[in-house]
């Protein structure tokens, strides 16, 4: 049986790893073993952060909506509650875009939400009763 030397395959594999690790600093871009290890970590980070990015964008949208809502004298929580009660189905991404691009339309949505909200039982009453 003929002996199989893996010269071509091994060099091709090493070349592909080193090519993929081109932008890394120091030994991680030049030495195969270090480059391979860094490549594994990099792919793990990329996989993890593609999923984390979705949550980060949601946080950003909520912050933007909250800022615009408070400028209209309502909290984010009450705004979302009112929009759900009014049957307005607009997601947070589009709501944040509306808040930035078209403040007048956002104010109209706030008015719709306010009209659909039940009376706040925790709000201070104007009847003058002392607690």
UniProtKB/Swiss-Prot annotation:
Disulfide bonds: none annotated. One of its GO terms (cellular component) is ribosome. Coiled coil: none annotated. Transmembrane segments: none annotated. The keyword Amino-acid biosynthesis does not apply. Keywords: Ribonucleoprotein, Ribosomal protein, RNA-binding, rRNA-binding. SUPFAM superfamilies: Ribosomal protein L20 (SSF74731). InterPro entries: Ribosomal_bL20, RIBOSOMAL_L20_CS, Ribosomal_protein_bL20_C. GO terms for molecular function: rRNA binding; structural constituent of ribosome. One of its GO terms (biological process) is ribosomal large subunit assembly. PANTHER family: 39S RIBOSOMAL PROTEIN L20. Belongs to the bacterial ribosomal protein bL20 family. NCBIfam families: rplT_bact (TIGR01032). Binds directly to 23S ribosomal RNA and is necessary for the in vitro assembly process of the 50S ribosomal subunit. It is not involved in the protein synthesizing functions of that subunit. This is Large ribosomal subunit protein bL20. It comes from Mycolicibacterium paratuberculosis (strain ATCC BAA-968 / K-10) (Mycobacterium paratuberculosis). The gene is rplT.
